[in-house]
Amino acid sequence: MNKIYRLKFSKRLNALVAVSELARGCDHSTEKGSEKPARMKVRHLALKPLSAILLSLGVTSIPQSVLASGLQGMDVVHGTATMQVDGNKTIIRNSVDAIINWKQFNIDQNEMVQFLQENNNSAVFNRVTSNQISQLKGILDSNGQVFLINPNGITIGKDAIINTNGFTASTLDISNENIKARNFTLEQTKDKALAEIVNHGLITVGKDGSVNLIGGKVKNEGVISVNGGSISLLAGQKITISDIINPTITYSVAAPENEAINLGDIFAKGGNINVRAATIRNQGKLSADSVSKDKSGNIVLSAKEGEAEISGVISAQNQQAKGGKLMITGDKVTLKTGAVIDLSGKEGGETYLGGDERGEGKNGIQLAKKTTLEKGSTINVSGKEKGGRAIVWGDIALIDGNINAQGSGDIAKTGGFVETSGHYLSIDSNAIVKTKEWLLDPNDVTIEAETHSRQAKSIDEELPNGDGALNNPKKNGESVTTLTNKTISEFLKNAKSVNITAKRKITVNSSINIGANSNLTLWSEGQSNGGVEINDDITSTGGNLTIYSGG
């Protein structure tokens, strides 16, 4: 959902500022023929620094008792901070890592608050100590990093503009001692209700800066944009960020109600996007596209306790180099109908859905109980020169969507690698896989003639209670068919390789044809008296067949 912003002339600033498309405009002329304000689609918006505007106004210092109505009860508890006010424009000059407690930290729609700091790496920590939520509806500007901590909740309005060198908003609290030590451990305040952060506005930061929205629940409906930096949506009860500039995140405690939702647009040009929560829902756009030969984007979505449900678009393209990297994990991972993952590039990127290669769980990666690619979903790791890698794992893995890991020209030379694996695996006849090499690695494999398509079922229905439940998952009430002979024969038409491995048994109940220069491997470890059972013809028109049965 792209937000459309336009330029609006501000009489009090005597300048153009970016505002929501819903805001009322102000013409430069009152004549009927005056041109309408220009419109632009926000991608990586670089706002004009507001410091030059404010300093030119010649503001003077006044007592904080007459401070603009949104900010109240300023108390500097560490470092120094001074304030200048002119009507609805407030400038605060602070020392490095200053800590300021507030009774209220709001910015009204007609207000502007600016923190002038010693350098770009300087930070100011603002904490609300009352029971009021923070509502940011106006402009927040700084040459440094701004932290806003409010355990009651934070809402960023649809007309709000945040333009800093780094921005962190959190409903999880942090002690003054941890701030001073630069130990960014944030925790849910004891006995406090679950608090939410919601962004409806525009958040931009300087090059290589970071935006972090941290809370019991986190929701983005607006636009967040960084260039080469990082954007994190983190929902939990205890979270540690070891480096706020290049976040390394330790996700300590989560509960089912800790949810992260993106309905808006998030752009981290050539940077990193982290979404971590108990459950995750994306219906907007997550983009870490790059045009750099030296750097590609990286996206991580981790639903620690529940489902990662993906609609919309996730993109980390790079047409100058290798596409980016994407990892989506959770108890359950679902790529919904119409969802698009695009990691294409000069060389295709890498994506991991539900786990890693063969479900080994290396480096502590979470393995999904169920991973679904719904019909009409797309994974694209294709490359102009070489295809990339797509790994899909689930204890139950249902593949009804499309996976493209093609290179250019001869796919036998430039194609990539696709793995669709799980203890129980079903490849629907609707699925289209384009790659050089395709690995399937379930417990058992059955190749049948095409019947009807799969219908989505819950985990309980896939693994019903009763005798042999885990060994007898269902497909529309029938035994699982791993894939159809049509799917495998179509794939093997032109110089491609399919490696089907099974821990127990491989059963071929319908005919297969292997095309010229293609390779089919049927490999059974032979556990539980398994092996390879062939009940129909396997023919070849210049291809190769390898059969191995262990046990």
Regions found by a protein language model. Name each.
Residues 2-4, 15, 24, 28-51, ...:
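Extracellular and secretory-pathway beta-repeat/beta-biased strand scaffolds
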Residues 6-9:
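Active-site and channel-lining beta-strand-loop segments
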Residues 12:
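IQ-motif-like calmodulin-binding regions
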